[in-house]
Amino acid sequence: ASLFHDTNGKKYVVSLEWETREGYEKPGAICMVEYSPEKQEIVGYPKRIWRGGTDRGCIEAPHLTKRGEYYYIMCAEGGTGYNHCVTMGRSQNVWGPYEKDPKNPIVTSVPGESYERQDPDHLKPKYYNPESILQKSGHGSYVELPTGEVYLVHLCSRPFVPELRCTLGRETAIQKMMWTEDNWLRLADGSNFA
Protein backbone atom coordinates (compact mmCIF):
# COMPACT_ATOMS: atom_id res chain seq x y z
CA ALA A 1 0.00 0.00 0.00
CA SER A 2 1.05 3.59 -0.47
CA LEU A 3 -0.19 7.01 0.61
CA PHE A 4 -0.96 9.68 -1.98
CA HIS A 5 -1.03 13.37 -0.99
CA ASP A 6 -3.08 15.31 -3.55
CA THR A 7 -2.38 18.96 -4.38
CA ASN A 8 -5.81 19.90 -2.98
CA GLY A 9 -4.83 18.65 0.49
CA LYS A 10 -6.72 15.35 0.36
CA LYS A 11 -4.93 12.10 1.17
CA TYR A 12 -5.60 8.61 -0.14
CA VAL A 13 -4.51 5.08 0.69
CA VAL A 14 -3.82 3.09 -2.49
CA SER A 15 -3.61 -0.67 -2.01
CA LEU A 16 -3.98 -4.09 -3.52
CA GLU A 17 -7.26 -5.95 -3.19
CA TRP A 18 -6.33 -9.55 -2.55
CA GLU A 19 -9.37 -11.74 -3.09
CA THR A 20 -9.26 -15.14 -1.40
CA ARG A 21 -12.58 -16.62 -2.50
CA GLU A 22 -12.60 -19.36 -5.14
CA GLY A 23 -13.24 -18.17 -8.67
CA TYR A 24 -11.71 -14.71 -8.15
CA GLU A 25 -8.44 -13.54 -9.59
CA LYS A 26 -5.62 -13.32 -7.07
CA PRO A 27 -4.39 -10.62 -6.78
CA GLY A 28 -7.29 -8.76 -8.24
CA ALA A 29 -7.34 -4.99 -8.46
CA ILE A 30 -5.85 -1.78 -7.11
CA CYS A 31 -8.19 0.04 -4.72
CA MET A 32 -8.18 3.49 -3.20
CA VAL A 33 -9.87 5.11 -0.22
CA GLU A 34 -9.67 8.62 1.18
CA TYR A 35 -7.77 9.03 4.45
CA SER A 36 -8.42 11.61 7.18
CA PRO A 37 -5.19 12.56 8.99
CA GLU A 38 -7.21 14.47 11.59
CA LYS A 39 -9.27 11.41 12.55
CA GLN A 40 -6.49 8.96 11.60
CA GLU A 41 -8.97 6.76 9.77
CA ILE A 42 -10.23 6.05 6.29
CA VAL A 43 -13.26 7.89 4.91
CA GLY A 44 -15.80 5.62 3.24
CA TYR A 45 -15.09 2.34 1.50
CA PRO A 46 -12.27 1.41 -0.89
CA LYS A 47 -13.08 1.68 -4.59
CA ARG A 48 -11.44 -0.36 -7.36
CA ILE A 49 -9.57 2.03 -9.65
CA TRP A 50 -7.19 -0.11 -11.77
CA ARG A 51 -6.92 -3.68 -13.02
CA GLY A 52 -3.57 -3.24 -14.68
CA GLY A 53 -1.91 -2.16 -17.85
CA THR A 54 -1.15 -5.60 -19.30
CA ASP A 55 -2.54 -9.11 -19.18
CA ARG A 56 0.44 -10.47 -17.26
CA GLY A 57 -1.52 -10.65 -14.00
CA CYS A 58 -0.19 -10.51 -10.43
CA ILE A 59 -0.73 -6.75 -10.12
CA GLU A 60 0.81 -5.20 -7.00
CA ALA A 61 2.83 -2.29 -5.58
CA PRO A 62 0.64 0.68 -6.58
CA HIS A 63 2.00 4.22 -6.55
CA LEU A 64 -0.14 7.24 -7.38
CA THR A 65 1.43 10.55 -8.42
CA LYS A 66 0.26 13.78 -9.99
CA ARG A 67 2.05 15.66 -12.73
CA GLY A 68 0.42 18.57 -14.52
CA GLU A 69 -3.20 17.74 -15.30
CA TYR A 70 -2.79 13.97 -14.89
CA TYR A 71 -2.87 11.49 -12.05
CA TYR A 72 -0.55 8.57 -12.82
CA ILE A 73 -0.81 5.08 -11.41
CA MET A 74 2.29 2.89 -11.55
CA CYS A 75 2.21 -0.80 -10.65
CA ALA A 76 4.21 -3.99 -10.84
CA GLU A 77 2.74 -6.80 -12.92
CA GLY A 78 3.70 -10.31 -13.97
CA GLY A 79 4.83 -11.60 -10.58
CA THR A 80 8.44 -11.57 -9.45
CA GLY A 81 9.64 -14.01 -12.13
CA TYR A 82 10.92 -13.47 -15.66
CA ASN A 83 7.61 -11.89 -16.73
CA HIS A 84 7.95 -9.03 -14.20
CA CYS A 85 7.33 -5.48 -15.42
CA VAL A 86 6.32 -1.91 -14.57
CA THR A 87 3.04 -0.57 -15.98
CA MET A 88 1.38 2.82 -15.95
CA GLY A 89 -1.99 4.46 -16.46
CA ARG A 90 -3.29 8.00 -16.17
CA SER A 91 -6.48 9.93 -15.54
CA GLN A 92 -7.54 13.54 -15.07
CA ASN A 93 -9.64 12.41 -12.09
CA VAL A 94 -8.04 10.81 -9.04
CA TRP A 95 -10.84 8.18 -9.00
CA GLY A 96 -10.36 7.31 -12.67
CA PRO A 97 -11.07 5.86 -15.04
CA TYR A 98 -7.38 5.32 -15.79
CA GLU A 99 -6.26 4.99 -19.39
CA LYS A 100 -3.56 2.40 -20.04
CA ASP A 101 -0.23 3.59 -21.37
CA PRO A 102 -0.26 2.46 -25.02
CA LYS A 103 3.34 1.21 -24.63
CA ASN A 104 2.77 -0.87 -21.46
CA PRO A 105 4.79 -2.29 -19.93
CA ILE A 106 6.99 0.78 -19.61
CA VAL A 107 9.89 -1.27 -18.19
CA THR A 108 10.52 -5.00 -18.59
CA SER A 109 13.22 -7.54 -19.42
CA VAL A 110 10.83 -9.47 -21.66
CA PRO A 111 10.67 -8.33 -25.28
CA GLY A 112 7.26 -8.42 -26.91
CA GLU A 113 3.94 -9.27 -25.34
CA SER A 114 3.15 -12.04 -22.90
CA TYR A 115 -0.24 -13.10 -21.64
CA GLU A 116 0.11 -15.17 -18.52
CA ARG A 117 -2.63 -13.95 -16.21
CA GLN A 118 -3.71 -17.46 -15.22
CA ASP A 119 -0.31 -19.24 -15.39
CA PRO A 120 0.42 -20.88 -12.00
CA ASP A 121 4.20 -20.93 -12.68
CA HIS A 122 5.17 -17.61 -11.12
CA LEU A 123 8.84 -17.79 -12.17
CA LYS A 124 8.03 -18.20 -15.89
CA PRO A 125 11.58 -19.19 -16.96
CA LYS A 126 10.42 -19.46 -20.58
CA TYR A 127 10.62 -15.64 -20.61
CA TYR A 128 14.34 -15.58 -19.82
CA ASN A 129 15.92 -13.15 -22.29
CA PRO A 130 19.57 -13.94 -23.13
CA GLU A 131 19.93 -10.46 -24.69
CA SER A 132 19.51 -8.73 -21.34
CA ILE A 133 21.92 -8.59 -18.41
CA LEU A 134 19.06 -7.51 -16.13
CA GLN A 135 16.23 -10.01 -15.77
CA LYS A 136 12.92 -9.90 -13.88
CA SER A 137 12.79 -6.09 -14.13
CA GLY A 138 9.72 -4.64 -12.44
CA HIS A 139 8.23 -3.17 -9.24
CA GLY A 140 9.38 0.41 -9.75
CA SER A 141 8.94 3.94 -8.53
CA TYR A 142 10.11 7.15 -10.18
CA VAL A 143 11.47 10.45 -8.93
CA GLU A 144 11.64 13.73 -10.82
CA LEU A 145 14.48 16.02 -9.78
CA PRO A 146 14.22 19.83 -9.65
CA THR A 147 16.46 19.84 -12.74
CA GLY A 148 13.75 17.97 -14.68
CA GLU A 149 15.71 14.71 -14.80
CA VAL A 150 13.59 11.62 -14.12
CA TYR A 151 14.82 8.29 -12.75
CA LEU A 152 13.08 4.99 -12.14
CA VAL A 153 14.28 2.66 -9.40
CA HIS A 154 13.14 -0.93 -9.90
CA LEU A 155 13.85 -4.50 -8.89
CA CYS A 156 15.74 -6.92 -11.10
CA SER A 157 17.92 -10.06 -10.93
CA ARG A 158 21.04 -11.35 -12.66
CA PRO A 159 20.78 -15.13 -12.98
CA PHE A 160 23.52 -17.68 -13.50
CA VAL A 161 23.11 -19.50 -16.81
CA PRO A 162 22.02 -22.19 -17.61
CA GLU A 163 20.39 -22.82 -14.22
CA LEU A 164 18.67 -19.39 -14.21
CA ARG A 165 19.18 -19.17 -10.46
CA CYS A 166 19.53 -15.71 -8.96
CA THR A 167 21.76 -16.23 -5.93
CA LEU A 168 21.85 -12.50 -5.14
CA GLY A 169 18.05 -12.44 -5.05
CA ARG A 170 16.20 -9.27 -5.92
CA GLU A 171 18.60 -6.47 -6.77
CA THR A 172 17.92 -2.78 -7.32
CA ALA A 173 18.48 -0.92 -10.60
CA ILE A 174 18.14 2.75 -11.47
CA GLN A 175 17.40 3.92 -14.99
CA LYS A 176 17.11 7.34 -16.57
CA MET A 177 13.63 8.16 -17.84
CA MET A 178 12.00 10.96 -19.81
CA TRP A 179 8.52 12.38 -20.31
CA THR A 180 7.22 12.29 -23.87
CA GLU A 181 5.46 15.19 -25.56
CA ASP A 182 2.15 13.40 -24.97
CA ASN A 183 2.91 13.02 -21.23
CA TRP A 184 3.90 9.37 -20.92
CA LEU A 185 6.96 8.14 -19.03
CA ARG A 186 9.63 6.27 -21.04
CA LEU A 187 13.15 4.99 -20.63
CA ALA A 188 15.56 7.68 -21.86
CA ASP A 189 16.34 5.63 -24.99
CA GLY A 190 12.62 5.52 -25.85
CA SER A 191 12.32 1.76 -25.36
CA ASN A 192 10.78 -0.28 -22.55
CA PHE A 193 13.65 -2.75 -22.35
CA ALA A 194 15.56 -2.65 -19.02
Question: What is the role of each PLM region?
Answer:
Residues A1-A194:
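Carbohydrate-active catalytic/glycan-binding domains of CAZyme proteins
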